[in-house]
UniProtKB/Swiss-Prot annotation:
Residues 1-24, 751-770 have a biased composition (Polar residues). This is Uncharacterized transcriptional regulatory protein C1327.01c. It is found in: Cytoplasm; Nucleus. It comes from Schizosaccharomyces pombe (strain 972 / ATCC 24843). Its main location: cytoplasm.
Length: 977
């Protein structure tokens, strides 16, 4: 035993020198067996650890590789034998020159910026390696002298390997003052290996590359990033919980997430199998109490709430400054249904231990052998995971510009909590966070997600004003990466372009938003996302001849295309064309969110209500709507919104051979489709406060509210157009409000400025008393529908505020703005109950708009327009002008007139607020916002503003609402947002 230790130490001390094999049998070439792979020196290797990494690779034909696939640039220039080791071969290491490998592929695997950055990283690594070579040799000598101590940790046979010069932490009990060099036989980095983390890359959106030229071989040399990392032992590591992401993980614990444990069949000979000695002040977590997620993709879709769990304010890091992260001394908790204990049934050969280094921003990884008698079998030392160097198989970027892992996880949590599902459904949440922890999410997606969600994070508000500009730094990098790869269609690029379009719409970059949205549509068409792949849409059995596509990947393709469809309808709300035709879509609607989370295949309908061809009849349920959730019905209602916009704003009304009131008109067909949508809505999806709470429990509360807000908005906007003449159209009056080309689509409403210079109202509508009764009934029903829809929108927004549901979609702001205009007219009407209810709801609308304008710059234009509308009504009332019902003089055939009254039964009933229940206090700041002096006598509008004082509405953020849900005592203003 002592002889083996002596031999191991001898090789370890010689690792920084020539690195030749110590086996005398290798000097005799005659003893090399035929067909045996040879090392770079032409001799047979005595141990697997001494074989170069490329010897285990396969050729394109699938055979064992027998020679070096590619030499470094220096060896090629000198025409000498190259060992092929990475990051530095023997020749370059001997002459202290940078070792650079050039890709042998004719196709560009990454951009020119990334190649330059990769070469710079290798050069810096080599400089650091040369600078500390003597220091490392002294450290190895110290290790040799301490080896004879009885309590020392045994070394592993894998140290007998040629010098690949990885760096790991010292294995001594006392921290060294310098880093220690240890050889590594595997040139592929642990963080970029595809075999070390137990996840399925096939079902991951990040690896779902649907073009053949995007499929990269993980074992290819160009897909391997250097495994040279630096660790300093000057500062003792700080330990936290070693756990992976869970779908129910509180946001306060996200910053303490550590990488997943490797699969039991994973082997990493490049890593030492000995544990790193951790100082006594670190935390030892017993194995029997440590829980990790064995497979997030199989996690049951059971969520506590989309409200964040209550934690102390000091530990709630989402609202603390970025430079001061509080780290709690406890492991994050997981539900019993979604975790697996570290028992005998789940005991990998070795468990990872990560050691931080604040000085060099590196990472060292070692393994704890479960069979080592000198280590504690009941504890696992864990420390915070730092950022690994991104693999060049994905679009890379300078690490200095990449957000820290903690911030990335935080912004991803904010994205799923505030954005995902309200605008687009793009990602599978468990798989996304698993890939994010494994650093396998394409950087273009990481930057795009950070760009959209940064505006909602209080960590970014301290450094950026206004808040909607907080993500611009990440958007710039996402644009660069997207434009570098725009000619290579990929599912991840489509998602990133959609998010960039959404971000630019919020920063008032309407041109960029329009163009990035168009690029996403083109790329989706190139990937044929509008068609099902193969003859088996559900992947029930492998009957297709081509490569099998899992249900999750198929569903991600569908959801990505439906997100493109929604973006097209949002962006084309006015004069812009709609590019996607409903007749060209041949995919089914998204499945229910619970089925999607559990990765269970389900049959749904297409947009026109059909079942896809090729689906076996045995798997088709009696009612396909059982498999359809909020996402599917959201697509259907937005499709109806697009049809209404096309009729009213894109010359559809002129091409209609029938007048709008006729039963056979296109207007009537849209009205019937809206009624059929509401009538066919399952009972579980009909709006109620209980339904909101039920969907809130599965993190679908905001999406559920958005569904019904979109329905009432579409119905109100459609019937608001009744009675408008060619000279009284908001499309001509409020063109400055409707931001053309913007993803934020603002619907038109009827608002005509009043000329009161002579005390007379100039109105284009002809108040003809001889108008027939059919026209009067039609216009009265249309106005009643608009007012009921407006009050329903305010009630849903108020319910969201009471249940702490965060509304952030810009499309919601469009509906709230329309409701404000309708209610402003009713607030000054002759109906007392309708006026008092409208005045109560006006504040709900205004509070949300004033809140959302901090996060979407284009909404500021709507707030300014609301102030003009309000001032117009005040001026009209002050002049003594009474509003009269004006009915256009048009002859309507009552027998052929469309039926509007049937819509009343599906409009959500809102409570009536009597005038006596309204308060007599006013908000001075809101009055001054609308152009009034703070001390103005406004008693004639008694009850317009309830008692809430909104002096601090500009300082309030969405974070204050979330803080209230977590029990933050500093919360004092409740905004619906």
């Amino acid at each position: 035993m002592m002889q083996q230790r002596s031999g191991s130490l001898s090789l370890l001390s010689n690792a920084v020198q020539a690195g030749q094999s110590s086996d005398p049998m290798q000097d005799d070439p005659a003893k090399t067996e035929p067909g045996t792979p040879k090392g770079y020196d032409g001799s047979k290797n005595s141990s697997p650890a001494s074989v170069p990494s490329w010897i285990h690779e396969k050729t394109k034909a699938g055979k064992d590789r027998k020679r070096l696939p590619l030499a470094c640039q220096s060896c090629r220039k000198k025409k000498v034998k190259c060992s092929g080791e990475r990051p530095s071969c023997d020749q370059c290491l001997k002459h202290n020159i940078p070792c650079i490998y050039k890709s042998n592929s004719t196709k560009r695997s990454h951009s020119r910026h990334e190649e330059i950055h990769h070469q710079q990283q290798l050069h810096l690594n080599h400089q650091y390696q040369h600078q500390h070579k003597n220091v490392a040799a002294n450290s190895i000598d110290n290790l040799s002298r301490q080896y004879s101590q009885p309590n020392h940790i045994n070394t592993h046979d894998s140290v007998n390997s040629p010098p690949s010069y990885g760096i790991m932490a010292s294995a001594t009990n006392q921290p060294l003052s310098h880093p220690t060099i240890v050889p590594s036989s595997n040139s592929s980095s642990l963080l970029n290996s595809t075999n070390n983390i137990s996840h399925n890359p096939q079902v991951s959106l990040m690896s779902a590359s649907l073009s053949k030229n995007l499929v990269l071989d993980p074992a290819s040399p160009k897909s391997v990033s250097p495994d040279l990392v630096y660790v300093s032992s000057d500062n003792p590591p700080v330990s936290t919980a070693a756990s992976a992401y869970s779908s129910s993980l509180p946001i306060s614990d996200v910053t303490r997430a550590l990488p997943l444990a490797p699969a039991s069949n994973s082997q990493h000979p490049s890593l030492s199998s000995q544990p790193v000695s951790v100082p006594s002040n670190t935390i030892n977590i017993p194995t029997d109490s440590l829980s990790i997620v064995s497979n997030p993709s199989q996690t049951p879709a059971k969520f506590d709430s989309n409200r964040i769990s209550q934690v102390p304010n000091s530990d709630y890091s989402i609202y603390s400054n970025f430079n001061n992260f509080p780290i709690a001394n406890h492991a994050p908790s997981f539900p019993q249904s979604s975790v697996k204990k570290l028992d005998s049934s789940f005991s990998p050969t070795s468990l990872p231990t990560f050691t931080t280094n604040s000085a060099s921003s590196g990472l060292s990884t070692s393994y704890t052998n479960n069979n080592d008698t000198t280590s504690d079998n009941n504890s696992l030392q864990a420390v915070p995971r730092l950022d690994p160097v991104p693999s060049l198989t994905l679009s890379s970027t300078p690490v200095a510009e990449l957000p820290p892992l903690e911030l990335r996880i935080h912004l991803a949590e904010v994205f799923f909590h505030c954005c995902h599902g309200q605008s687009y459904n793009l990602f599978h949440r468990p798989t996304f966070f698993e890939s994010l922890n494994n650093n396998t999410v394409p950087l273009v997606v990481v930057y795009a997600v950070c760009a959209v969600s940064a505006r909602f994070s209080s960590r970014m508000h301290d450094r950026f004003s206004p808040p909607y500009m907080a993500g611009e730094q990440y958007a710039r990098e996402a644009r660069r990466l997207a434009l570098d790869n725009f000619d290579r269609p990929d599912l991840s690029l489509v998602a990133a372009l959609l998010l960039l379009s959404l971000h630019d719409s919020g920063t008032c970059e309407t041109g960029k938003s329009w163009m990035y949205g168009g690029m996403a549509l083109r790329m989706a068409a190139a990937l044929q996302l509008n068609c099902e792949q193969g003859s088996n849409p559900l992947d029930l059995d492998n009957i297709d001849s081509g490569p099998r596509i899992s249900f999750l990947e198929r569903e991600l393709r569908r959801r990505t295309f439906w997100s493109c469809f929604l973006m097209d309808r949002y962006a084309s709300s006015h004069e812009h064309l709609q590019f996607l035709d409903e007749n060209d879509i041949g995919i089914q609607l998204p499945v229910h969110e619970l089925l999607f989370t559990k990765q269970i295949a389900g049959v749904t309908q297409t947009l026109d209500g059909r079942i896809l061809e090729g689906v076996p009849s045995i798997v088709i349920p009696a009612d396909t709507t059982e498999n359809m959730g909020v996402a599917a019905y959201t697509v259907k209602i937005i499709a109806l919104w697009g049809r209404a916009v096309k009729y009213l704003k894109q010359d559809g009304k002129r091409r209609d051979p029938y007048p709008y009131w006729h039963r056979n008109s296109d207007f009537s067909h849209i009205s019937e489709a809206l009624y059929a949508w509401a009538d066919g809505l399952p009972q579980r999806l009909k709006y109620s406060a209980v339904g909101l709470e039920n969907h809130l429990s599965i993190q679908q509360g905001a999406q559920y509210a958005f569904l019904h807000l979109a329905y009432h908005h579409t119905l109100m906007w459609l019937f608001r157009s009744i009675g408008e003449t060619e000279n009284n159209q908001l499309s001509k009056i409020s063109s400055s409000v409707s931001l053309a080309g913007n993803t934020v689509s603002f619907s038109p409403v009827s608002h005509t400025p009043i000329n009161v210079t002579n005390g007379e109202s100039q109105n284009n509508s002809n108040n003809d008393p001889s108008a027939n009764g059919a026209a009067r009934r039609l216009h009265k029903a249309a106005r009643e529908i608009c007012l009921r829809c407006a009050n329903a929108i305010s009630m849903i927004v108020d319910d969201c505020r009471k249940h702490n549901v965060i509304l952030t979609s810009p499309f919601i702001a469009s509906g709230v703005y329309t409701a404000f205009c309708v209610q402003a007219e009713a607030a000054f009407g002759s109906n007392v109950l309708a006026a008092s209810t409208a005045r109560h709801n006006l504040e709900i609308d205004l509070r949300l708009m004033l809140e959302m304008k901090n996060y979407w710059g284009s909404i500021s234009a709507l707030c300014d327009k609301m102030s003009e509308i309000w001032a117009d009504w005040v001026q009209r009332t002050s002049s003594g002008i009474q509003e009269e019902d004006t009915i256009p003089n048009e002859m309507i055939d009552e027998e052929r007139m469309l039926d509007l009254e049937k819509h009343f039964m599906y409009i959500t009933e809102s409570p009536i607020v009597p005038n006596q229940a309204a308060q007599k206090s006013y908000s001075p700041d809101l009055m001054s916002y609308f152009g009034f002096a703070k001390n103005s006598d406004l008693q004639q509008w008694n009850g317009l503003w309830p008692s809430d004082d909104l002096r601090n509405y500009q300082e309030s953020t969405i974070d204050s609402l979330v803080a209230y849900a977590t029990g933050n005592p500093g919360w004092n203003i409740s905004f619906a947002g």
